UniProtKB/Swiss-Prot annotation:
Claim: Hydrolase is one of the keywords in the record: yes
Keywords for this protein: Cytoplasm, Endonuclease, Hydrolase, Nuclease, tRNA processing
Subcellular location: Cytoplasm
Keyword Transmembrane: no
A GO term for molecular function: ribonuclease P activity
Gene: rnp2
Reaction equations catalysed: Endonucleolytic cleavage of RNA, removing 5'-extranucleotides from tRNA precursor
Domain of life per record: Archaea
Protein name per its UniProtKB record: Ribonuclease P protein component 2
Subunit structure: Consists of a catalytic RNA component and at least 4-5 protein subunits.
CC annotations in GO: cytoplasm; ribonuclease P complex
Function of the molecule: Part of ribonuclease P, a protein complex that generates mature tRNA molecules by cleaving their 5'-ends.
Length: 120
């Protein structure tokens, strides 16, 4: 008889936080440009080991409002916020990453910080 595969109980799983951000730049940016910039900012500010521990993951970006969501490990939220703040240029265009807020769920993040930008 086969046994059921073991899984981690919720108390042992990694806890994530979601960061809402706005990109203010000289021109509108595409999703792929922002995704690459977030990853490169994480690597340059935190290094390979820090990025591996922080586990940044690009969730969504709205090209119309230039706002997006990034997932990060709970213990490394401030480090990723710092990395995004240090990002000043994307493909030769000056840019500012403005953190709108941090939440434990995407639903609450959209309701609290991204509703004014047309997110549902």
């Amino acid at each position: 008889m086969r046994e059921k595969p073991k899984y981690l109980p919720p108390t042992l799983r990694d806890k994530n936080r979601y960061i809402a951000f706005q990109v203010i730049g000289e021109r509108p940016f595409k999703k792929d440009e922002i995704k690459k910039a977030v990853w490169e900012a994480s690597l340059s500010a935190l290094g390979y080991l820090g990025s591996a521990r922080a586990k940044p993951w690009f969730i969504k970006f709205d090209e119309k409002s230039q706002t997006g969501i990034v997932r990060v490990d709970r213990k490394h939220v401030e480090e990723l916020r710092f990395a995004l703040t240090m990002l000043t240029e994307i493909n030769g265009s000056k840019v500012i990453f403005r953190t709108l807020g941090v939440s434990g769920t995407i639903k609450r993040l959209k309701r609290k910080f991204l509703a004014e930008y047309g997110w549902r």
